[in-house]
From Swiss-Prot:
It comes from Mycobacterium tuberculosis (strain ATCC 25618 / H37Rv). It catalyses: isopentenyl diphosphate + (2E)-geranyl diphosphate = (2Z,6E)-farnesyl diphosphate + diphosphate. One of its GO terms (biological process) is polyprenol biosynthetic process. Belongs to the UPP synthase family. Z-FPP synthase subfamily. Its main location: cytoplasm. This is (2Z,6E)-farnesyl diphosphate synthase. Optimum pH is between 7 and 8.
Amino acid sequence: MEIIPPRLKEPLYRLYELRLRQGLAASKSDLPRHIAVLCDGNRRWARSAGYDDVSYGYRMGAAKIAEMLRWCHEAGIELATVYLLSTENLQRDPDELAALIEIITDVVEEICAPANHWSVRTVGDLGLIGEEPARRLRGAVESTPEVASFHVNVAVGYGGRREIVDAVRALLSKELANGATAEELVDAVTVEGISENLYTSGQPDPDLVIRTSGEQRLSGFLLWQSAYSEMWFTEAHWPAFRHVDFLRALRDYSARHRSYGR
């Protein structure tokens, strides 16, 4: 037996959403600048909803990504990073992977639409997803403005360990090109030097990392950048992630005291 009658659920939901909005408006200065999101649970959502084809979950999840980014923009968040395809995901069934890459390509093109006026960057190795999808993603991203009020990173073909290795290699390659000695190469490997060569170079580290579907781990997502990030987990599968869930994450973040390891 349901405690709350169905006819009352929608009004109560709207009232709760309004209260969350009002509370956040009072703590505007405490909002995160950069939110990173692990969009987990698309396949589990599809199966729990009775769909044999998990690609339906991916499509519903893709629609939620575009919606969530609008929430970020409306809330005044400056930067959002969404984890769309990890290097581990590339080991999935070929047919499932092909469908997933096609859906990701479609949603990135939607995110990059001129009407949004968002600046979009890919983070990861597009060479891992095939020539045609990579071409479409590069074309979409390059069409977005460099200067905008809202920036989006789409992590595709991304692995946190791989990013750190790539950053160190890029750092050493630059030093070698400048004629560095072996001793100078060793001295060049610093926290600042690695940070400057990450995929997210020039951007602030994430203040808040959100993961859906009940999993409480980073799974290689922004390993270097999230050293002092606040974490927020929810049991909701990604396609079922609601605006009130997003607002609750912001509310909980605004109530925390960040010590940055001190």
